[in-house]
Amino acid sequence: MAIAVGSKLPAPPASLWENAPENSVTFPETGKIILLGVPGAFTPPCSSQIPEYIARYQEFADKGVAGIYVIAVNDIFCVKAWKEALAGGKDSQVHFCADSTGEYIKTLGLDFDASGLLGNHRSKRFAAVVENGEVKSLFVESEAPEITVTKAETVLGGL
């Protein structure tokens, strides 16, 4: 069952990693965060979507966002390299998380079969605004390559 507005965000599994194997991700229990699901690191649409979130991070922070978490169904080494490529070698306040088996994305109910192009199940492209552990807004693209309702500008406008 997919998460929905008003539902509690499930805790991430220990296998959701950031920067290194075994470096498990936890989300703050209080405050406002944004989760971004993307089909794949280094894919052209995903690589064009995320830089806007990096560039506009301070605008999100000014609206009370304590963290932005990008989740891709890729291995940790791929996701870390993607972060470094998109952030231009600079430290980014946007978190890049690897859900290598897709376990968390499946728990959220936001996976789809991308085996024809990307080899396995992947994350739908989505943006979720979560406050104090509750989903306040959820934007899901109808087609994976589209970037309309999940654009940084659109999500900022809804905060």
Where are these regions (language model features)?
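Chalcogenol-based redox active-site neighborhoods
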Residues: M1-L159
